[in-house]
A protein has these predicted regions:
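C-terminal alpha-helical cap/extension of soluble enzyme domains
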Residues: 2-3, 7-17, 27-31, 55-57, ...
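Active-site beta->alpha loop and helix N-cap motifs at the rims of alpha/beta catalytic domains
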Residues: 3, 7-161, 171, 180, ...
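Surface-exposed charge patches
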Residues: 50, 111, 214, 239, ...
Length: 333
């Protein structure tokens, strides 16, 4: 891990950075689908993009844990960026997570991701155990300062081996103004103080599938980066909440909460079953695994089929409304 910059100071430094629109709303992070030969399936990726755009998403993300990033080669990751950018065609911003473990590796990846159409990049604490927090901040700060794209930082203590404190994230943002958003994952009560403090100058996104989506909104978050299988419901929750219809937003959240809970027990289960639910809702008949994959059970597939019937299909047409099945489920009529 390359650590060449000075340690961050807990004071704000004035730097000139380009102004950008604030990010908000629902930015689903796509699954990686494979063909029977184990190679990436571009058509399935494009179908996901279409479904998310049809649901009215505000952006699209790639290459996080949901995308099985550590199963992909660097070239495969960049292929996904290029394919997604071509399909999105500038309609919403595209953010790509950076998985390389050196400063130069990350900067090389960011440069190429920008060339292929990414608008933002997301950095994570490098997966190197035993490194002092200050050194992790130096690493992230150097990449952010030299990145040709605006940067977000994901901190996920529940699903990542290395994470940093909320105070460290605040210092990182103060000292490196190219860091424009944070994905702060964890129980809403744990991140609320951070979200309210940071959201004055930084866009704060929740995660964990949106399991606390309305609570996250109350706590100061401006957006959500979930897996895509509930994108229509979660975009509608955002729309209702933003228009002041908070009770209807809460009702819709309660309707899909059992499905989110089913997916949230463990990351391998989300990848195995969430991907299959997304496939069912998009009309894909077969999901091919890239081995090794956690085994799916017949009962699990039955449950996913039941969820798909409750939710109804995802439509690719722009401005597609919630399915009648999902409206009935939420009592929205």
């Amino acid at each position: 891990m390359e650590l060449q910059s000075q340690p961050p100071k807990l004071v704000e430094e004035e730097r000139s950075v380009p102004s950008l629109p604030r990010l908000s709303g629902v930015h689903p992070i796509l699954y990686a689908f494979y063909g029977p030969d184990g190679r990436l399936d571009r058509a399935a990726l494009e179908r996901q993009v279409d479904a998310c755009l049809g649901a009215g998403c505000h952006g699209i993300a790639l290459l996080g844990l949901v995308t099985e990033v550590f199963r992909l080669s660097t070239e495969e990751r960049l292929d996904l960026v290029g394919w997604a950018a071509a399909r999105i065609a500038g309609r919403v911003p595209l953010m790509a997570t950076v998985a390389e473990v050196s400063v130069h590796g990350q900067l090389d990846f960011i440069t190429e991701a920008k060339r292929r159409g990414a608008d933002w990049v997301v950095l994570q604490p490098p997966p190197v155990k035993g490194v002092p927090e200050r050194e992790i901040l130096r690493f992230l700060g150097e990449v952010a300062d030299r990145s040709p794209l605006p940067v977000g930082v994901q901190n996920n203590p529940l699903n990542m081996e290395v994470s940093v404190s909320s105070d460290a994230l605040l210092a990182l943002h103060r000292n490196h103004p190219n860091i424009r958003f944070m994905k702060a994952e964890g129980p809403a009560v744990s991140v609320a103080g951070f979200a309210r403090e940071a959201s004055r100058t930084c866009d704060i996104f929740a995660g964990h599938g949106g399991i606390e989506w309305p609570t996250n909104l109350r706590s100061g978050c401006q957006g959500l980066i979930p897996a895509p299988e509930l994108v229509d419901a979660q975009v509608e929750i955002w729309r209702l909440w933003s228009s002041g219809e908070t009770e209807r937003a809460e009702a819709l959240h309660r309707a899909v909460l059992p499905i989110i809970a089913f997916m949230s027990r463990a990351l391998p289960l989300l990848v195995a079953y969430g991907k299959r639910l997304m496939a069912m809702r998009m009309g894909l008949e077969t999901v091919h695994a890239r081995l090794p994959e956690p085994g799916v059970t017949s009962f699990g597939i039955e449950e996913i089929g039941r969820f798909a019937a409750l939710l109804g299909p995802l439509h690719a047409e722009p401005g597609a409304a919630l399915s009648p099945a999902l409206k009935r489920l939420a009592g929205l009529g």
